C-alpha cells in the first residue's frame, strides 16, 4: 500500500497508469455498448436525448483522458522512456506520482457530474450556449469542467517531466538524433500538451465564469461570442488528437523494426522530422472543425490546404513503415498483426480525413456519422491497435511472463472483425445524411445501424477475451528465461521484469 501510494518509481507509477487506464477503458467500453444498444434499433431504448448525450459525452471524455492518454503517455511513457534513455528514473519522480494521483479524483468528478441533476449532455466539445447556465442548469457541467481541469494539470505536469527527462537525463552517447523513436514521439506529445492544454483551461474557465459569475465571454447579449469558445476549444482539440496518436506512432515504429529483424526503422531521421512536422502543423489547422460556422471563403481555403499538408508527413511515416517491412521474412506474431492492422486501418482513417479536409465537402458531412467513422478509425483502430500491439510486445519485459500466442491471434481476429463491422458501415450512414448525437433515427438507416451494433458486440467479446488472456498469463506464471528478440533497443537489455532500480550504473552508447 505505502509502496504504491507514495511511489517515486517510474515502473510502479507506469503500472498504476496501466491499471487505471484498463479500468477506465472498461467503463468507457460499457458506455459505448450502451450507445450501440440504443442505436441498434429505431425507437427509444434507454430514454431521451439528454441521457443519451450524457452517455456519449462521458464515453468520449473517459476514452480520451482516462484511457488512451494514461495508458500511452503514463503507462508506456513512464515504463519505457527512462529505460530507453539509460536514465535511472524520471527527472521529477514525486511530481510523477502526483500526475497519476490527480487522475482518480478527475475521473470521480466526471462520474459524479453524470449522477447529479441531468448530467452534462453537451458532447465532449462542451459548446455554449448548450453548455451555458440556461440550457444546462445545475452542477453537472461545472463538475465536468473541474474534472477536465484536474486531468489537464496532470497532463501538463507529466509533459514538463518528460521534456525535462529527455533534455537532461539522456545517457552518454544518446544524442537527439540517436534517441529511440518512441522517446521522440513522447517528447513531441509532451510539447503539444504543454502548448495546447493551457488554452483549453482558459476556455473552460471562461465558460465556468459565464455560468456562475455573470461574465459573458460566450454570450452575445453581453458582447461575447460563442464562436470564440469554438476557436479556443479546437486550438486545444486538434493538437489533442495528435497527442492521442503520436505515442502510438512511436510504438509501431519499434514493433515493426523489431519484428522485421531490421536494425532500425527505415528513414529514422525522416521519421523524427515527420513527427515534428505533424506536431507543428497540428496547431495551425484547428478551424477545419468549424467549416460550418460561416468563416470567410479565403479562411476556409487556407484551413483546407493546411489540413491536407498534414497528410504528407503522415504519408512519410506510413511508407517508411512499409519500407521497414520490405524484404523481411515475417513471422506473424500477435504484436506484428496489431501493427500491420494499425498501418492499414490508420491509413483508411487518414484517407477519410483528407475527404473531410475539403471545406465544401465537409459542409455536407459535418456532424454526420461520416465524421464518427473517420475519427473512430484513427482512434479505435489507430490508438487502440497501437496500445494492443505495444502491450503484447512489451508485456514479457514488464512482467517477465508470456502470453498465450495462439489465443492472442484469435483475439486479434475477433477484434479486427468487430471494430471494422462497427465503424465501416458508419461511412455509409454519414453519406446518407444520418446526423451524430441523436438517440433515434428514421427507419431508412436501420440496416447499417444493426450491422454496427453487432460489430460492437463482437468487439466487446474481443476485449473480454483479452482480459481473460492476461488473467491466464498471470495465474500460470510462465517465466521468461531470456528475451527471444534481437536487442533492437536498449530496454531489452534489462532483466524480465527489470530490477526495481535499473541503471544504478549508467550505460554508455558507443559508436
From Swiss-Prot:
Enzyme class: translocase
Cofactor: heme; Cu cation
Binding residues annotated for Mg(2+), in chain numbering: 366-367
SUPFAM superfamilies per UniProt: Cytochrome c oxidase subunit I-like (SSF81442)
Principal place of residence: mitochondrion
Pathway: Energy metabolism; oxidative phosphorylation
Record-listed heme a3 binding positions: 374
Gene3D superfamilies hit by this protein: Cytochrome c oxidase-like, subunit I domain
Any Gene Ontology biological process: mitochondrial electron transport, cytochrome c to oxygen
InterPro entries documented for this protein: Cyt_c_oxase-like_su1_dom, Cyt_c_oxase-like_su1_sf, Cyt_C_Oxase_1, Cyt_c_Oxase_su1_BS, Cyt_c_oxase_su1_dom
Pfam families given in the database record: COX1
GO molecular function, one term: metal ion binding
Binding site for Fe(II)-heme a: 59, 376
Catalytic activity: 4 Fe(II)-[cytochrome c] + O2 + 8 H(+)(in) = 4 Fe(III)-[cytochrome c] + 2 H2O + 4 H(+)(out)
Domain of life, per lineage: Eukaryota
Chain positions recorded as O2 binding sites: 242
Keywords noted in UniProt: Calcium, Copper, Electron transport, Heme, Iron, Magnesium, Membrane, Metal-binding, Mitochondrion, Mitochondrion inner membrane, Respiratory chain, Translocase, Transmembrane, Transmembrane helix, Transport
Entry membrane topology: Multi-pass membrane protein
Residues annotated for Ca(2+) binding in this entry: 38, 43
Binding site for Cu cation: 238, 288-289
The protein's assembly and partners: Component of the cytochrome c oxidase (complex IV, CIV), a multisubunit enzyme composed of a catalytic core of 3 subunits and several supernumerary subunits. The complex exists as a monomer or a dimer and forms supercomplexes (SCs) in the inner mitochondrial membrane with ubiquinol-cytochrome c oxidoreductase (cytochrome b-c1 complex, complex III, CIII).
Protein name according to UniProt: Cytochrome c oxidase subunit 1
Source species: Drosophila sechellia (Fruit fly)
Upper classification of the organism: Eukaryota, Metazoa, Ecdysozoa, Arthropoda, Hexapoda
